[in-house]
Amino acid sequence: MADLGFGDARSGNGSRSQCSRGKAMLLALGKGLPEQVLPQEKVVETYLQDTICDDPATRAKLERLCKTTTVRTRYTVMSKELLDEHPELRTEGTPTLTPRLDICNAAVLELGATAARAALGEWGRPAADITHLVYISSSELRLPGGDLFLATRLGLHPNTVRTSLLFLGCSGGAAALRTAKDIAENNPGSRVLVVAAETTVLGFRPPSPDRPYDLVGAALFGDGASAAIIGAGPIAAEESPFLELQFSTQEFLPGTDKVIDGKITEEGINFKLGRDLPEKIENRIEGFCRTLMDRVGIKEFNDVFWAVHPGGPAILNRLEVCLELQPEKLKISRKALMNYGNVSSNTVFYVLEYLRDELKKGMIREEWGLILAFGPGITFEGMLVRGIN
């Protein structure tokens, strides 16, 4: 890992250089989770009861999906009490967008505030020192947006500069890191609070043969929030950075805009995921990663550490095979998927939390690493990062 100082960023593989002057760093993390814990072994019964479904074929398919996701635990806003209050949510063909948004807007604010307070507590400085807020969600829709309500709830100064990134799906967290990095490096002395908050309430509905992906969502996706604080020029006596954000890039794959497809309707959001998503990612991932690694002259994929948004096990498996990665390279991504499910924009931050733990324990020998996420577009988000002692 790099020492906390200033120097030339281009050190190559295997060396331990000082940190680059003016580069953004990850200073703190936090998360917020719903009270309802959903063990994977209870998903089938819970979902079928919640949706009043007794179809044997649906049960069999959901059981198969739950076994293949590798998820063990998720957290969810949805509850029996919520469904008792809003029985229309489990009635097929009912216009429910308004109550769904009412539930989602309140839930993401509460979860986001919890995550932000956790990050602020770890950071150790007052909320008034936050100069910018980057807010990410694919679960709310309102004016003014959740960024304003979150800033108010946290007691941020009225002149805090706010940026919202909405409906970016699974690439939203990495996009927020890229945005925060650019803000921090172009506004000396700034401290950027990043908050991502998601819930699956917007897409919850009874199973239907016309929407086979609904069962994938029931088996894979979870709810939660995460937060991070980004800044350049850390104060040695007050801040403890663990990751330097060196270089970021984004790329979309032309002609793939229907592979990850979501539409807001009167019944919520209808979401579809193409079976060829892992293949599409595999076809481009090597060149995309080399664009990042070439910045520091690294040629071998096993010579960096990896923090990949775990959209599902199929994508991680394809990456591991395609790039000939050692099994431990994607261990923290698989761990995040196992313990939280796919929480859309949040999940990459849960991966980074595990990365921080391994960096602190000296379990990672590589100096450089990659953060990756894939979202609608198909959009690739990538960042070259460096661990800090």
Swiss-Prot record:
It is an enzyme of class 2 (transferase). GO terms for biological process: flavonoid biosynthetic process; pollen wall assembly; polyketide biosynthetic process. Pfam families: Chal_sti_synt_C (PF02797), Chal_sti_synt_N (PF00195). Its EC number is 2.3.1.-. It comes from the Eukaryota. Keywords: Acyltransferase, Transferase. The active site is at C170 (nucleophile). InterPro entries: Chalcone/stilbene_synt_C, Chalcone/stilbene_synt_N, Polyketide_synthase_type-III, Thiolase-like. One of its GO terms (molecular function) is tetraketide alpha-pyrone synthase activity. Disruption phenotype: Small pollen grains with irregular shape. Reduced spikelet fertility and mature seed formation. Plant type III polyketide synthases (PKSs) that catalyzes the condensation of fatty acyl-CoA with malonyl-CoA to generate triketide and tetraketide alpha-pyrones, the main components of pollen exine and potential sporopollenin precursors. Belongs to the thiolase-like superfamily. Chalcone/stilbene synthases family. This is Type III polyketide synthase 21. It comes from Oryza sativa subsp. japonica (Rice).
